């Protein structure tokens, strides 16, 4: 794995939660709804869910977390969740780097994620990385989600 990335530890949860709120605030603005799951989650829920995921992080020169992606493995299948980059570090390839690092780290064959159908910037990024939408569903908070998959031969 690229030395720019590391696996988050429990001591990082508070900083990750702060990053999550800052990163997904712009998502809420873009889609016109605050019903974004990452913004609806409490700190306590976030802490409890941490153990269910592996979280890959990137820090800046000062040691502050500037990007993260969580994932979980099931055989050769990876579920990706909560790709997030600090607003002041966007458009520098950080999200793409995190996603690529997960692929390299896991050596899995199938990667899946979901995002709001109005998240055009995210969908564009995922498509550049080789993800394709395989279904769309309306969520329980009046949002529709695109489920995307990438398969590596």
Feature locations, PLM:
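Conserved acetyl-CoA-binding loop-helix of GNAT-fold acetyltransferases
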Residues: 82-85, 91-104, 124-128
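A short helix-loop-beta-strand connector motif used in the catalytic cores of GNAT acetyltransferases and
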Residues: 45-57, 79
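Conserved GNAT-fold acetyl-CoA-binding loop/helix
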Residues: 18-46
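Conserved GNAT acetyl-CoA-binding A-motif
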Residues: 99, 105-117
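Conserved beta-strand in the GNAT
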Residues: 64-72, 77-84
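Conserved beta-strand-loop-alpha-helix junction that forms the acyl-donor binding cleft
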Residues: 90, 113-123, 139-143
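A short beta-loop-alpha structural element at the N-terminal edge
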Residues: 4-18
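Conserved beta-hairpin
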Residues: 53-69
């Amino acid at each position: 794995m690229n030395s720019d990335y590391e696996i988050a530890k429990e001591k990082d949860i508070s900083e990750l939660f702060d990053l999550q709120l800052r990163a997904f605030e712009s998502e809420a603005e873009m889609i016109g709804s605050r019903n974004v799951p990452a913004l609806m989650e409490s700190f306590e829920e976030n802490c409890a869910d941490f153990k269910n995921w592996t979280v890959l992080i990137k820090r800046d020169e000062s040691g502050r977390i500037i990007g993260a992606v969580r994932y979980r493995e099931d055989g050769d299948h990876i579920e990706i969740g909560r790709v997030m980059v600090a607003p002041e570090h966007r458009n520098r390839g950080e999200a793409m780097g995190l996603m690529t690092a997960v692929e390299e780290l896991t050596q899995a064959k199938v990667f899946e994620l979901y995002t709001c159908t109005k998240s055009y910037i995210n969908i564009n990024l995922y498509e550049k990385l080789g993800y394709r939408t395989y279904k769309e569903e309306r969520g329980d908070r009046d949002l529709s989600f695109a489920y995307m998959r990438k398969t590596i031969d």
